[in-house]
Amino acid sequence: MKEFNWPVRVYYEDTDAGGVVFYANYLKFFERARTEMLRSVGFEQDNLLAEQNLIFVVRSVKVDYLKPARFNELLDVSAKVIEHKKTNFTFEQSIIRQQNVLCTAEIRIACLDAQSMKPKLIPSAILEHLN
């Protein structure tokens, strides 16, 4: 799959006392883009849990904060699978405001059995859509 993009508006609740986006909230923006990426190819995470006892969890995160985002700005959040193995994906993600890169991340997502919390094979149907 090509790079997926999702618009995010910065709300007051996303900012800190200095009026800039609180650093942890960038992770929420990245999460929304990955969720919407899955949704765009027909996979709802609640259905994956109910039907296949499958969940996705963050395994590791590497983030570089380059420039601040501020209240009421419209941002573009991207997500692209750059590597996949049998039980995990690695996403390359960025947050951009008018061609200015504000934040980049490499996020590894593991596929787990929801009950045992042990690694589970990523369904082939998902891999077909995200590669």
Tell me the role of every PLM-derived stretch:
Residues 38-76, 80-89, 109-110:
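Hydrophobic beta-strand-centered segment that forms part of the acyl-chain substrate-binding groove
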Residues 2-58, 114-131:
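Hot-dog-fold acyl-thioester-processing enzymes
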Residues 4, 39, 70-72, 82-131:
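HotDog/MaoC-like acyl-thioester-processing domains
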